[in-house]
């Protein structure tokens, strides 16, 4: 394909416009940035954006796609030119210009009446031939300030087709799903053995008046057990029900048995203590009292000494007295 420059596309413009960021930064006056087109061949940075046919309002698809002389990858200026597909936004294509990276951009404005932004039907055409040279580490000002939508000529990622059986999996149920549902239900409803019988509500405790309690205690002191007729008569006299009188006597008998058992145990322990005390006192008295003299031992010194012998006694006077008595008998 023959490379068509911006001046061929727009013959009405006599002089192409070219500018560079280094000229803007280094030139003392603002108008000096517009230099000749010979700066296109300067490969200082290697990154260029060809403006010829780039900023064309109503420039048409052919101008946008072929403005770089390369394969117009993203051309959206109209129904389509010989260099790239049709589109409506910006156009960028890699071209064989001097430098490592050469990006040709064609940004078309609103579509004109002459076939999607053509020069014949557009409001006006602005054409500039030049290179915007930007270092690799500097972002493009135009691309950052005015982001353009991606062109229709971009290579689209093919959509993954839906699996034929995915929609059918929603209706499937697995055993672990059933167990999980059952476990969740048991957590909220409780175990079936717990729900078999509802919990019984505790009845409030019945309170009796002091007069009723006094009459019941008197009757219980006289009679621990009541017959049916006696219980009915007592309940009628105290304005109580038969069940209340029966329950009160049952509880009172239980309390009486417990108190009686405790009292009996206390009496038994006290009797044991008294018995031990009496035995100890009797033993002490038996040790303190002297044994009566045997008439046979009085005449026999040996028997007398054996009778009065007390090995557990430490009193030496008794031993001397025994020896003296034995010597006297001899």
From Swiss-Prot:
GO terms for molecular function: DNA-binding transcription activator activity, RNA polymerase II-specific; DNA-binding transcription factor activity, RNA polymerase II-specific; RNA polymerase II cis-regulatory region sequence-specific DNA binding. The modification N6-acetyllysine is found at residue 236. PROSITE patterns: HOMEOBOX_1, HOMEOBOX_2. Keywords: Acetylation, Chromosomal rearrangement, Developmental protein, DNA-binding, Homeobox, Nucleus, Proto-oncogene. One of its GO terms (cellular component) is chromatin. Residues 201-260 bind DNA. It is found in: Nucleus. TLX1 is oriented in a head-to-head manner with TDI. Both genes share the same promoter with robust bidirectional activity. Controls the genesis of the spleen. Binds to the DNA sequence 5'-GGCGGTAAGTGG-3'. Interacts with MEIS1, MEIS2, PBX1, PBX2 and PBX3. PANTHER family: IP01054P, T-CELL LEUKEMIA HOMEOBOX PROTEIN 1. It is linked to A chromosomal aberration involving TLX1 may be a cause of a form of T-cell acute lymphoblastic leukemia (T-ALL). Translocation t(10;14)(q24;q11) with TCRD. This is T-cell leukemia homeobox protein 1. It comes from Homo sapiens (Human). The lineage of its organism: Eukaryota, Metazoa, Chordata, Craniata, Vertebrata. The gene is TLX1.
